[in-house]
């Protein structure tokens, strides 16, 4: 249930928060989302009940769309001949982080407990926000208008370009298959006859890192 709520939040963030990068400065959006992530992660770490965890997980999912803001930034600051490679590097980092985090969280959860992993994640988000404030330049928005007009323009793209309708379906099926595999695999490995702990289950993430690293080469 927690994983499902988090993914619902992620979808909400992709649909309603990522487009704000064309309306407001992306640096501010990223820092605000990092701040909310820190609060939500600390809330989960100190949560007294499952309902609090579910609510904070929804916020965590919504704010976890930050990497999707970095992808157009990488494209914007790249030379035309290097755009594909640089975007691929960012995507590789995103996918590698998803898989490597399973390994790290599994080990930390097994040794110290799951709450400690959320404390560590909050500290890492704080470090990331500091790096963004120091390194990322101010990028002026390129859309002049209201948020409602911005959202309408997105739907007009769906009507105008068939590729824009096709690519999200393909990506959604691929990512859905990916999440289904890894989510179910964790439960299966924890049951008979394996009875694996979170550290062993997390190690399975190493199997997919090689494929994630190859994204920059495809």
Question: Whereabouts are the PLM-identified features?
Answer:
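Cytoplasmic helix-loop-helix junction between adjacent transmembrane helices
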Residues: 56-92
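Conserved MFS/SLC helix-loop-helix module at the cytosolic interface between two early adjacent transmembrane helices
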Residues: 12-48
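Transmembrane alpha-helices of Major Facilitator/SLC transporters
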Residues: 202-218
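Short hydrophobic/small-residue motifs within alpha-helical transmembrane segments
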Residues: 7-8, 95-96, 205-210
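Helix-loop-helix hairpin linking two adjacent transmembrane segments in secondary transporters
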Residues: 52, 89-134
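MFS-fold secondary transporters
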Residues: 40-44, 60, 132
